[in-house]
């Protein structure tokens, strides 16, 4: 993805998930979104090559980590399958992204021929893309969810730095995309982080706040799904007003006040844990992303 890279290692003989690793996308320093990265390739003669080199090196390292966790070796790796937005797939395969930058937003390929440039001698296959801004991650998601086999209309959402939507069923889908911004990936949020170890991924209320953490252990921050969950729970508990204001303790329900403090502007700051909090600015960033 634009913000996060996740690798899952499977034993295909028995279908077992052997290990999972994730990290910030190594290209993040070149731009928070795909438009910034496309621009980088247009402004520098070696831009595309540099971005390709960064992401391929990162995937190689993450695969090494995944294999180590599973006590497996590179010699056992038979195939690498990648699904991502169209720009990310192009950059990994060392292809030009100039055509995606302007009307009619035509990519060099939609990866209908899935074979890509091998990584360390291991064959690489890409999920087929739909268009310049509807990538192989959407195709993979529709297949994995089973929506392609269902009657009637169903809405599939991929909410991240780029937001894609697909509406339809077994007779086909209509797809579109929007630049939703990095908030859904935890970027620009005071305690935000990608969906990697330590990220709060789900929040719920059950006589108190309960949460799930990616990889287990102590929470370090909020990823996109955790941010959405927390905002929904706070709205339900009347800590966030209908218009989106995060209330200070004196305006919030009595049972919620121990999690709140007042900021310098008269709004609330909510503390899920001593290390993980939500500010009024975070709520606003989420509203803008939506």
Where do the model's predicted regions map?
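Phosphate-binding active sites in nucleotide-utilizing proteins
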Residues: 13, 31, 64-68
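Gly/Thr-rich phosphate-binding beta-strand-loop-beta motif of the actin/hexokinase/Hsp70
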Residues: 1-27, 153-171
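Short acidic/His/Gly/Ser-rich catalytic and metal-binding motifs that mark active-site loops
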Residues: 28-34, 91-92
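Helical "lid/coupling" subdomains associated with nucleotide-phosphate turnover
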Residues: 37-64, 77, 89-158, 164-290
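Secondary-structure boundary motif
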Residues: 68-72, 147
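Core structural elements
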Residues: 83-87
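Membrane-interfacial loop-to-helix junctions in multi-pass inner-membrane proteins
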Residues: 72-78
């Amino acid at each position: 993805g634009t913000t996060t890279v996740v690798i899952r290692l499977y034993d295909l003989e028995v279908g077992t998930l052997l290990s999972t690793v994730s990290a910030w996308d190594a290209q993040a320093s070149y731009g928070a979104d795909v438009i910034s990265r496309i621009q980088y390739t247009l402004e520098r003669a070696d831009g595309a090559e540099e971005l390709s080199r960064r992401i391929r090196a990162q995937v190689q390292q993450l695969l090494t980590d995944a294999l180590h966790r599973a006590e497996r070796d590179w010699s056992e790796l038979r195939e690498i399958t990648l699904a991502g937005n169209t720009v990310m797939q192009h950059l990994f395969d060392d292809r030009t992204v100039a055509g995606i930058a302007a009307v009619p937003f035509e990519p060099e390929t939609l990866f209908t021929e899935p074979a890509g440039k091998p990584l360390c001698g291991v064959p690489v296959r890409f999920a087929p893309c739909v268009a310049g801004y509807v990538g192989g991650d959407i195709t993979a998601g529709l297949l994995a969810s089973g929506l392609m086999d269902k009657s009637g209309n169903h809405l599939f959402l991929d909410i991240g730095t780029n937001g894609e939507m697909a509406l339809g069923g077994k007779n086909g889908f209509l797809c579109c995309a929007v630049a939703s911004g990095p908030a859904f990936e935890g970027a620009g949020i005071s305690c935000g982080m990608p969906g990697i170890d330590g990220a709060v991924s789900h929040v719920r209320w059950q006589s108190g706040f309960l949460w799930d953490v990616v990889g287990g252990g102590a929470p370090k921050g909020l990823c996109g799904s955790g941010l959405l969950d927390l905002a929904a729970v706070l709205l339900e508990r009347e800590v966030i007003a209908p218009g989106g204001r995060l209330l200070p303790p004196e305006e919030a329900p009595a049972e919620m006040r121990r999690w709140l403090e007042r900021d310098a502007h008269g709004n609330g700051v909510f503390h899920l844990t001593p290390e993980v909090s939500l500010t009024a600015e975070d709520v606003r960033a989420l509203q803008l992303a939506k």
